[in-house]
Amino acid sequence: MRQILIAVGLALAVSILLTPVLIRLFTRQGFGHEIREDGPPTHHKKRGTPSMGGVAILAGIWVSYLGTHLVGLALDGEGPSASGLLVLGLATALGIVGFIDDLIKIRRARNLGLNKTAKTVGILAAALLFGVLALQFGNADGLTPGSPELSYVREIATVTLAPLIFVLFCVVLVSAWSNAVNFTDGLDGLAAGAMAMVCAAYVLITFWQYRNACATSPGLGCYNVRDPLDLALVAAAAAGACIGFLWWNAAPAKIFMGDTGSLALGGIIAGLSVTSRTEILAVVLGALFVAEVTSVVVQILAFRTTGRRVFRMAPFHHHFELVGWAETTVIIRFWLLTAIACGLGVALFYGEWLTAVGA
C-alpha cells in the first residue's frame, strides 16, 4: 500500500508541475489546437489552446513507476515486472502515434493530422506487438502477462482462444479503447477526470488480486494474475498523472491532452484489462468511453443507411451541448456517471469473489 501511495503522489507531482512548463513552451512555439468548424460554436474560442499535454501525463506515469520501484528496491522490494512494462510500453507506443498526429495538426494549422491509414497502422502495430508479447515472459508459476482465456473478473475456463485469435482479440481491444478515450476527449477535463476514476478502480481491483493471489494465498477465490501489485502501481501512477493534469485541463482548459494523451490512456485501459484478466469488466468500468465510441458508430451507420442522424453531433457529449446543456454541466454529469460505473464495476468484482469463497 505504501508503494501505491508513493506512485500516486509522484505522478501527481510530476504532472501538475510539468504541465504549466509545457503550456508556456507550447504557447511560445505556437503549438495551438485547431477547432472543428462544424463543432459547437462555443468551442471556437478554444482555438489556439496548447495541445499535446499528454506528454506530461506519460512523463508523470513513467517517473512515478520507475521512482516507486527505486524506493521499493531500497526497501527490499521487487523491480519492474513484465506485465507493468508491457502496459506502459503499449501506452507509450500509442502516445507516440498520437504525438505525431498532434504535431501534424499543429504544423498544418488544421484539425486533421495523420491520415486514417497511417494512424490505423500505427495503432495496429502497437496492438499487435502487445498481443504477441502478452503471451511471453512466463514466470516460475507459468503465468504470462496475458491469458488466452477470455476473462470477466477472472479467466473464463470454458472460453480459450487460440494464440492467433488472442493476438487479434488484443488488436481489437487496443484499437477500441484507444479510439474510445480519443473520442471522449472533446470537453475540458472530461477524459482526464473519467480516466482518473477508472484507474482508481483498477488500483482497488489489482491490489485485491495481489492480496488474494494464488501464488501466495492459494485457496478459494484466488487470482492467477502474473504481477498484480505492479499493475496496481501502474494504475496508481496513471490515476495520479491524470489528476495532476486535470488541475490545468479543467474548464476552462489551459491545455489539452491531445491524441498524445488520449491514445496513451486508452492503451492503459486495454493493457490493464488484459493483464489483470478483466477484459469484460473493463466495459463496465469504462462505460462512458464505451458509450462515446458507440455513439460515433451509431451515428455513422444511421447516416449511411437512412441518411438521417441519431444525434445532433457525435460523439454524443456534443449532442447535449447542442440541445442546450452547458459544457460544465455535461462534464460533471458524465463524471458522475463514470463514478457510478466504476462503483458498479468494483462491486461486481468483489461480489464475484464473495461468491467464489462461498461467503
From Swiss-Prot:
Pfam hit, one: MraY_sig1
Tagged with keyword Ligase: no
MF term (GO), any: UDP-N-acetylmuramoyl-L-alanyl-D-glutamyl-meso-2,6-diaminopimelyl-D-alanyl-D-alanine:undecaprenyl-phosphate transferase activity
Single Gene Ontology BP annotation: cell wall organization
Enzyme class: transferase
Pathway assigned to this chain's UniProt record: Cell wall biogenesis; peptidoglycan biosynthesis
Reactions this protein catalyses: UDP-N-acetyl-alpha-D-muramoyl-L-alanyl-gamma-D-glutamyl-meso-2,6-diaminopimeloyl-D-alanyl-D-alanine + di-trans,octa-cis-undecaprenyl phosphate = di-trans,octa-cis-undecaprenyl diphospho-N-acetyl-alpha-D-muramoyl-L-alanyl-D-glutamyl-meso-2,6-diaminopimeloyl-D-alanyl-D-alanine + UMP
Function field: Catalyzes the initial step of the lipid cycle reactions in the biosynthesis of the cell wall peptidoglycan: transfers peptidoglycan precursor phospho-MurNAc-pentapeptide from UDP-MurNAc-pentapeptide onto the lipid carrier undecaprenyl phosphate, yielding undecaprenyl-pyrophosphoryl-MurNAc-pentapeptide, known as lipid I.
Family (UniProt): Belongs to the glycosyltransferase 4 family. MraY subfamily.
PANTHER family the UniProt entry points to: PHOSPHO-N-ACETYLMURAMOYL-PENTAPEPTIDE-TRANSFERASE (PTHR22926), PHOSPHO-N-ACETYLMURAMOYL-PENTAPEPTIDE-TRANSFERASE HOMOLOG (PTHR22926:SF5)
NCBIfam families from the UniProt entry: mraY (TIGR00445)
Protein name as annotated: Phospho-N-acetylmuramoyl-pentapeptide-transferase
Organism of derivation: Mycobacterium sp. (strain JLS)
